[in-house]
């Protein structure tokens, strides 16, 4: 059974943890976060179905003072896991990679990280074979993932030499007020990171 850890228990991390916990061939060792955010508080209110590890030991008191039990540190989670799913904010995954390397733990990074964090810039539909056997994968962003599925399917059928598109998306997920207007639309500068991806 593959032992999996999740770093970052936000919008993406919650989905990853729930997905891993539902698999018959995986064991969720735990999730790591830094503060008693809304998802972490909800985890506690659900009776802690997943072990919570502090990503910043020096700030463990933020969690314990809020009455949230802590099972250990991010490094202890990494030591126990075979693979880490890193859903932390952009740039944090690259810092976490140092811990993953130290413990020879494989990792999959979310789309906000820079491409050089991983061996393969990975999309399960378009280049699955390149990811097989790699130790570190970086996933495309959620918007890019959807675009790649559609464009790749058409490309395989009839060929797509070039695409031009406009992406209209919300600025931030509910609860992520620090990223900007929640549930609002914003026109991005061109090219966006989706174009580069």
Task: Report each predicted region and the residues it spans.
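Catalytic core of tubulin tyrosine ligase-like
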Residues: 160-197
